[in-house]
Amino acid sequence: VAMLQPCNTIMFVPDYCDNCMEMHVSLQQFDEHAHGALVDRWQVYHGEPPDVQWALVDIDATRFHEMFIDGEGLCRENALKDIERTICKTLNENKDAVRKQCHKETGVEVTDPFVVGVDPLGIDIRAPFGIVRIQAPVPFASSQQVMQYFAIV
């Protein structure tokens, strides 16, 4: 997360509803040179930020209705992280397939899709207006499943 100052950090929740989960988080500042991969990943999703300080966000706890959940119980690593870069590269070489699937699943027309992330629950595509998320019909367990979903042989 790019942040200005910890005391000035605000999380904006556009719509509150009865099924919202409230989170208590902690920010831990880090040096962008020591953790360049994290900075690169953020920039792939969001573009070049202004002069900022960088922070990791840890979920301390959450509340959902009357339940309180420890943050560690919500943190999972991306099971596809070791092959994510290869999947993104292959999908970005097949923009027509990504464009068609994006429109079919979300109704959003993305003229120049750029896949920036893949996890078992879906695919993130950067568009000129923001990130479009395609939910996986069933959790992806392999790159082959992702390619089959996009009809890439």
Predicted feature residues:
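Binding-site signature for planar aromatic cofactors or substrates
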Residues: V1-V153
